[in-house]
Amino acid sequence: MESALAKKGLSKDPEAELHRAIGRTIREARKSQELTLKQLARRTGLSVSLLSQIERAESSASISSLYKIASALRLRMAELFGGA
C-alpha cells in the first residue's frame, strides 16, 4: 500500500508533504514571474539541477538555499512554508 501511495505522489510522511509543498510554491512563484530554472539559478547561485530537485521534492533544501530562493523570488521565508 505504501509503495502504491508513493507512485501516485502521495505519502503519509509529513516531512515529504512539506517538501512537496515548498517545491510547488517555488515552482509556482518562478513561473508566475516568467523565470526559467536557469535564470533562477543565476539569481541564487544554486545549480539548475538542485533547483529542479527541490521543485520536484526529490531533494530537501538547506535553510541557506531556501533563503536564497525566497530572496530571488521576492518572497518571505514564511511564504515557502505556506504562511501568508
Predicted regions and their residues:
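A short, Lys/Arg-rich alpha-helix, primarily the initiator
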Residues: 6-32
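Residues that mark the N-terminal boundary/hinge immediately upstream of a DNA-recognition element
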Residues: 25, 36, 62-65, 76
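Short alpha-helical DNA-recognition segment
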Residues: 34-53
